[in-house]
Amino acid sequence: MAKPFEKINDINKMKELWKIAVKVHHQWTVISNNKEHIELIFVDANGTDVHVILPTTLKATFDSVLFVNNTYTVTNFLPQINDLMFKTSEHPFVIRFIAGTRVSDINKHEIPGKRLNFKPFSEIISGNWRNDLLVDVIGLVEEIGYKHMSAGSKKQQVNLILKDLV
């Protein structure tokens, strides 16, 4: 008998063998110390999301498999405490792919896209938000402020003035 799917909400450190049906909501590449790894946001059929980390050693294996808006069955991954400085998900854990992680059933699941939870500017200004959690905002770029280079880096900082459209 096939192992049933579990929900992202149920992911914890109490076990190692998981089987989830997910949709890739977002994907990006992180470069650190001249090494690249992939990070993603998975969402399940209940709309629950979780941050996912694919280490450098597995990047080549999954880079040509995982795409935004595709659905997958993902098994055998490592849940770890979400201690990231800036969290993309409220889930207390992140999923880390390991050598035994398997991805299959491409686009065989019916999973809607992640619901965006827009935060009004008034709540942000009043401090009514978690400062370690990234939030969704929608607004109009009213003005582009000054640009400057970060000291000792090639990174550029650009300040934007946003206008709330609510």
Where are these regions (language model features)?
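Single-stranded nucleic acid-binding proteins centered on OB/S1-type folds
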Residues: M1-V166
